[in-house]
Each structure stands twice: as C-alpha cells, then as structure tokens.
From Swiss-Prot:
Phenothiazines, including chlorpromazine or thioridazine, abolish binding of RamR to promoter DNA in vitro; thereby probably derepressing RamA. It comes from Klebsiella pneumoniae subsp. pneumoniae (strain HS11286). This is Transcriptional regulator RamR. Keywords: DNA-binding, Repressor, RNA-binding, Transcription, Transcription regulation. Residues 7-66 form the HTH tetR-type domain. Disulfide bonds: none annotated. InterPro entries: DNA-bd_HTH_TetR-type_CS, Homeodomain-like_sf, HTH-type_TetR-like_transc_reg, HTH_TetR. The gene is ramR.
Length: 194
C-alpha cells in the first residue's frame, strides 16, 4: 500500500524548486531540488510525475500569489486608469522586493517554453478583472498579437530594473518606484489616459 502524500514534503519541494530555479534557471536538476528539500529524488516524482509538472505547478502557484497581492492593492472605488495602473505597479514592485527568490524564479520560468499554454491560460483566467484593468489604457498596438509580447517585455524590464534599484537603495525606494512607474506609464499607455 502506498504511503499518503505529505503536504509538508510537497511544500518543501516547491520551496526548494523556487530557490533552485531562481539560482540556476529551469536547468536546475531534480536531484538538487530533492536534496535541498531533504527528500530522495524518487520522492519528488511521487509528488510531481515529471519536472515539467513541477515547473508548471510552481509557476501557477507563484503567479496566483502575485496576482492576489496585486488585486489586494486595488481601490475598488478608483476609476482613473492611471491610478489603477499605479496601484498595480506598486503592488508588483513591492512583491518583487519582498519576495526576491520567487520573483527571480518566476522571471526565469516565464521565459521557458516548458510552461504550458494551459498553465498560462489558468493564470490569465483566474483574475479576469485585473487583466481587463491592465488593458484599459494600454496603447492599442501593445494589445495586438504582433506586439503584445513586446509590450509585456517592456513592462517586465522596467519592473525588473525598478525592483533591483529599490532593493539596493531602500531609503530612496519610494522615489525609485514612482519614477519607474512614470517611465512605464509613458512607454506603454495612451497619452490621453488619466
């Protein structure tokens, strides 16, 4: 009879995978992940049938925590697109500063072709209101299929730079985050959006 799975072991594996993917990218070995979690490699495969399954489950878990954080920072009464965008930006940057390992892991995993379309769809469909809000004032070209990935990359590059500088200079972090927001806003949003 198979032993029941332990949530503690699964959580330890997810935490070890987060650190491993943050440090080594998705090339991190399952044996290193298992060793870091304090379990045998075979145990890892009792919880995740393949490395890709581990990668996708971790990606989904981190993204959902991030999006919940971003939604929590929204003011339901705020109707101005720029202020909503500012709240989303501030929540995203604050999350990245507070969770450097998860942020680094998610950035590396997001580039992987091993993250399935189904996993990406689950993230997008989990919080449609956030997705809609983000699109309210974005330049139309960045909503097109041809330039959507480019617009996303611009946002993430500016966010990455802002997180890095805010992390290394906590006394000026608020100013850095505000300047980063203005740079992102001018790059990606329609001039008449307020």
């Amino acid at each position: 009879m198979a032993r029941p799975k332990s949530e503690d072991k699964k959580q330890a594996l997810l935490e070890a995978a987060t650190a491993a993917f943050a440090q080594s990218g998705i090339a991190a070995s399952t044996s290193a992940i298992a060793r870091s979690a304090g379990v045998a490699e075979g145990t890892l495969f009792r919880y995740f049938a393949t490395k890709d399954e581990l990668l996708n489950e971790l990606y989904l878990a981190i993204k959902l925590r991030l999006v919940r954080t971003m939604i929590a920072g929204l003011d339901p009464d705020e109707k101005r697109p720029k202020e909503n965008a500012r709240n989303i930006w501030n929540s995203y940057i604050d999350w990245g500063v507070r969770n450097p390992m998860e942020h680094k892991a998610i950035r590396r995993m997001a580039l992987s072709e091993r993250i399935t379309d189904e996993t990406r769809r689950q993230v997008k469909e989990s919080f449609p209101e956030l997705n809609e809000m983000c699109q309210l004032s974005v330049k139309e070209i960045f909503l097109s299929e041809a330039y959507r990935a480019f617009g996303d990359a611009l946002f993430l590059s500016l966010a990455e730079t802002t997180i890095e500088f805010a992390s290394h200079d906590p006394q000026r972090a608020r100013e850095i985050i505000a300047l980063g927001f203005e740079a992102m806003w001018h790059a990606l949003h329609e001039a008449d959006a307020k």
